[in-house]
Amino acid sequence: MVEAKTGPLAGIRAVTCSTAQAGTVPYMLMADLGAEVIKIETPNGGDGSRKAGVLLGDDEAISSFFETNNRGVKSVTLNLKSEEGRAILYRLVETAEVFGQNFRPSAAARNGFDYETLKKIKPSLVYASVSGYGQLGPEAELPGTDAVGQALSGIAEAYAAPGQPMRTGVVSVADESCALLTFGGLLAALIHARNTGVGQKVETSLVGSAVRLMGWTLTTTMWRNRNPITGARINGTRERPGIAACFNDSNGKPLVFQLDSRHWKQAMDALGFWDRLEERGASDLGLALESDEMKDLILG
């Protein structure tokens, strides 16, 4: 006997044709909260990420990447290019509250699972579409990746040292932020559908989600008309000051700090800098020291 799932999303069924990380994590999170998630995979190997990451086992190797991003999800193989495969998909959609995919816009329509098609089958359906660059515009049909999202949003520049090329981080911040925003959008749309009987389409993108992570930096840039990286930096390095940083001291001991306005004044007082900073109009915690000339002006 199969045990009934529990959790706040118990009783919700989601069907997804999503792959990779940004496309699958929202539904993994739904499964964690009790939803039944059915993942549609292609014939001849299924989701390509089944062969990504570290593989354990011999004949039936298990992928660390796939397991990380598809935990608790059921899987079925369908050929959605065939009439029979699409007919089975449509029957599943009739029984589901949520459908998700991360295909390019034209591919979803070409394969018969775009929003306009599926909402005719179930008007209350909550439909999520994850893309690289959004549904409209010149890049809409281009494939997107986490690295591209980090680069176009400015995150890759923020990771780099001054004068060095852009550098993407080890953590898939564009993929994961997109997944979390998609998850939040799905929950909001589910509440709306429960209250009104009308479904909604949730659209997210890798670049748009990564730009959200740069929000405070970009807002401060507009207000101060400064470089978005050095002018509004939260996390500091030895070369680029910030209000938070992680270093190793001369003995290798990790040093971590983050300042708020009160601690900033106390620290500058203790170092004997506060009066000098006030005289030069540079006592604002958010001020970034952008050049040697600026440093000399304030601290010289």
Each model region followed by its residue ranges:
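N-terminal helix-loop segment corresponding to the beta1-alpha1 unit
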Residues: 1-198, 222, 229-230, 285
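Glycine-rich beta-alpha junction loops
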Residues: 44, 132-134, 206-211, 251-253, ...
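Beta-strand segments within the central parallel beta-sheet cores of soluble alpha/beta enzyme folds
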Residues: 199-207
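Active-site-adjacent elements of ketosynthase-type condensing enzymes
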Residues: 213-235
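Short Gly/Pro-enriched turn/cap motifs at secondary-structure boundaries
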Residues: 66, 229-239, 245-246
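A structural signal for well-ordered alpha-helical scaffolds and beta->alpha junctions
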Residues: 62, 141, 179, 183, ...
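Aromatic-enriched alpha-helical interface/lid elements that frame and gate functional surfaces
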Residues: 243-300
